[in-house]
Amino acid sequence: DEIKARVGKVAELLKLSAMLNKKPDELSGGQQQRTALARALVKDSDLILLDEPLANLDFKLREELREELPKLFEDRDCIVVYATTEPLDALMIGGNTATLLEGNVIQYGKTLNVYNKPENLISAKVFSDPPMNIAEISKSGEIFKIKDNNVQWKSNLKIKDGNYIIGIRP
């Protein structure tokens, strides 16, 4: 009964209730992807690995699932590894985030901390949608130079004179 209840809840969430008795070859590509996601969510596992689970879903369903998946994960006593290239997905899921570069973790921490205080340019770029505006600046006293433009800027930032790269999110 517990399994039937979980299947029903996940099937409803993923809009699969009408397809529960269909064979795999009778399902569209999107329905097959949702079915694979449903199988992962129904199982009582200690670890769930999800690789781009929302990638090929239509916009409306993807937006609904961005809201609902975190709620499903909260009810589970398991570890969820959610691989995504979508910053919004990572922010919605929350928890901890690892930024990877060529298979190596270059930043790890609470998702909002990684977003708000990226430790490197790669983490900053990965977590920006739309893309972050990147500029090289130099600081001398209270003068900041961006390209050939001098800007006098009083700041509470305690940074040394020198060259920097700044990122501005739109």
Predicted regions and their residues:
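Glycine/charge-rich catalytic "coupling/switch" loops of P-loop NTPases
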Residues: 147-170
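Short aromatic-centered micro-motifs
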Residues: 99, 144-145
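A sequence-level detector of short linear motifs
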Residues: 107, 141, 152-154
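Beta-strand-connecting loop/turn residues
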Residues: 103, 140-143
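ABC ATPase nucleotide-binding domains
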Residues: 1-120
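C-terminal boundary and immediately downstream tail of ABC-type ATPase nucleotide-binding domains
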Residues: 116-140, 167
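Short, well-ordered turn and helix-capping elements at secondary-structure junctions
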Residues: 24, 58, 130, 148-150, ...
